[in-house]
Swiss-Prot record:
Gene Ontology biological-process annotations: sensory perception of chemical stimulus; signal transduction
Protein name: Olfactory receptor 3A2
Organism: Homo sapiens
PANTHER family tied to this protein: OLFACTORY RECEPTOR
Family: Belongs to the G-protein coupled receptor 1 family.
Transmembrane regions listed in the UniProt entry: 36-58, 67-88, 110-129, 150-167, 206-229, 247-270, 282-301
Keyword Glycoprotein: yes
Length: 321
């Protein structure tokens, strides 16, 4: 059965089910659309290029064949996926001057966006666990963070994220949309679609809060707990150089964690706000464009190993070690 069938209005009503949505986009003036197109295209090329460069460095550079960089490579794949789910479709709409998206395509975009964002939550938690073992239990680090454990953590992240995305998508498909169909955003997401539903969204919003607490709250608590132990261990290091190295490996990850969870809480924990849509556009740009574009810079800026590997890739040389 088509997902669209699930949202048809009840028999006996004169309302017509919405077959497509109109995404209003970032700007509605035609004069600004070419500017937005150029900026988004530039951001997409920079983001995909930067993250794929990080992935290539992790794959080909022996110095980066470590658990921390294994997770970083997976994070780069997620960043490419996140921006690819939203930006190319928007670029296509800007070129064709067609702002509509079918109902099924909207739900598909919703599913894949939450799949990738959910994986981010748990992958960042796995990276915090990796730093905890590396700094607090260095003698048993190699056995506790074996390749099998690494793959299991990534697989568990995927399974949890898939369950979360499927839950929200199925719950959304049970809502009725009878018009209006204008989404004040540039991609399909839960808060904006809730505003358009002609049936009650109380259960959906309750589900979003409950699952959001599990998907974001639990990883955030685990990350804070891990880094409290890491901070205590680092402060016990007598060598200034040792402290500096430990903080540098954790600083990049903490920056990404703050950016990721901060915008997630702002976006999904304030449903019901009448002025939410315009603010959500800015948050959406940060989620799908700026954050994935910044991550390669954040992780390579203070990491000489990553910088060296990137230079070797760009210059066409391989490390001999």
């Amino acid at each position: 059965m088509s997902l669209q069938k699930l949202m048809e209005p009840e028999a006996g009503t004169n309302r017509t089910a919405v077959a497509e949505f109109i995404l209003l986009g970032l700007v509605q003036t035609e004069e600004m659309q070419p500017v937005v197109f150029v900026l988004l295209l530039f951001a997409y090329l920079v983001t995909t290029g930067g993250n794929l460069s990080i992935l290539a460095a992790v794959l080909v550079e022996p110095k980066l064949h470590a658990p921390m960089y294994f997770f970083l490579g997976n994070l780069s794949v997620l960043d490419v996926g996140c921006i690819t789910v939203t930006v190319p479709a928007m670029l296509g709409r800007l070129l064709s001057h067609k702002s509509t998206i079918s109902y099924d395509a909207c739900l598909s975009q919703l599913f894949f966006f939450h799949l990738l964002a959910g994986m981010d939550c748990f992958l960042l938690t796995a990276m915090a666990y990796d730093r905890l073992l590396a700094i607090c239990q260095p003698l048993t680090y190699s056995t506790r963070m074996s390749q099998t454990v690494q793959r299991m953590l990534v697989a568990a992240s995927l399974a949890c994220a898939f369950t979360n995305a499927l839950t929200h998508t199925v719950a959304m498909s049970t809502l009725n949309f009878c018009g209006p169909n204008e989404v004040n955003h540039f991609y399909c997401d839960l808060p904006q679609l809730f505003q358009l539903s002609c049936s009650s969204t109380q259960l959906n919003e309750l589900l979003l809060f409950a699952v959001g607490f599990i998907m974001a709250g639990t990883p955030l608590v685990l990350i804070i707990t891990a880094y409290s132990h890491v901070a205590a261990a680092v402060l016990r290091i007598r060598s200034v150089e040792g402290r500096k190295k430990a903080f540098s490996t954790c600083g990049s990850h903490l920056t990404v964690v703050c950016l990721f969870f901060g915008r997630g809480i702002f976006n999904y924990m304030r449903l019901g706000s009448e002025e939410a849509s315009d603010k959500d556009k800015g948050v959406g740009v940060f989620n799908t464009v700026i954050n994935p574009m910044l991550n390669p810079l954040i992780y390579s800026l203070r990491n000489p190993d990553v910088q060296g590997a990137l230079w070797q890739i760009f210059l066409g040389r391989r490390s001999l070690t």
